């Protein structure tokens, strides 16, 4: 998808969806929509394997998805009031000691 091969990406995602008994993705997805669809599929396929949060952080979608979840559960907007400095994990102390050019992530 990121290299512009939308149809090829859609083919692979549709194979996964078909195996699960789901409908194919819509035919008219653009690159951003396909990226979101792929992130969602990864979230369902790899549930509880520890990838979802990191995928969302890497693509800048963590707060968006967390806020969607709160809206779904509570039926109204309840923005995530957690400390946004905790989106990134701390860099291990050993890594900081080995490389003085590293800067610790905000909030740690």
What are these regions (language model features)?
Residues 1-108:
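Acidic/polar-rich alpha-helix caps and helix-coil junctions
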């Amino acid at each position: 998808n990121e290299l512009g091969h939308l149809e090829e990406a859609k083919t692979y995602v549709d194979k996964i969806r078909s195996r699960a008994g789901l409908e194919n993705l819509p035919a008219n997805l653009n690159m951003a929509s396909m990226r979101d669809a792929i992130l969602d599929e990864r979230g369902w396929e790899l549930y509880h394997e520890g990838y979802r949060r990191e995928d969302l952080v890497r693509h800048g979608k963590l707060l968006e998805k967390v806020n969607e979840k709160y809206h779904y559960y509570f039926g109204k907007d309840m923005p995530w009031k957690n400390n946004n400095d905790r989106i990134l994990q701390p860099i291990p102390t050993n890594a900081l000691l080995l490389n003085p050019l590293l800067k610790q992530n905000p909030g740690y």
